[in-house]
Amino acid sequence: MRKSHHGFTLIELVVVISIIGILAATALPRYINLQTQARVAKAQAIFGSIKSAAALARANCMVDLATSTAPTCTATAGATNMDGLNIAMANQYPTAADAGIIAAAQLNAGSDGVAITGTNPRLIAINGATTPASCSISYTEATAGPTAPLITLTTTGC
């Protein structure tokens, strides 16, 4: 009587392991690239949020200047109220401080996965980037009159 054998042969096992190795070698670079793309997308989203918040704060300041007999936002300093938050202003745009553009854009270092450093310019770096300073958004306050603040996006180190 012959016994039937159950299981895999050594050759079958080697072939399966080789196929899994080849698939892993092709999938790993794509996975790593997805993380980079995700950090770039996050930086672009925060960049857009900061630009929009600065424009909205300026519009709010302009309305305050035009309609109020005692405006809180003046041509050079002051504050404006956005969504119940008092936004610090300089030259009709948010300051680079926490009470300025950080509050206007409603950024939170902990929950947004960013590191917020510097004073003017203010640097918002994406956590987990290869070179955090090169995966960041920089906000420099407006220096005079209706000149917009300098907002730059750097994604070379994401």
Task: Set out the residue ranges of the language-model regions.
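Periplasmic/extracellular, small/polar-rich flexible segments of pilin-like filament-forming proteins
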Residues: 59-158
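Short glycine-rich loop/turn motifs that provide flexible caps or phosphate-binding loops at active sites
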Residues: 6, 17-20, 47, 83, ...
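N-terminal single-pass transmembrane signal-anchor helix
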Residues: 1-35, 42
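Short amphipathic alpha-helical "recognition" segments used for binding
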Residues: 16, 39-41, 96, 110
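Membrane-proximal N-terminal amphipathic helix
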Residues: 38-65
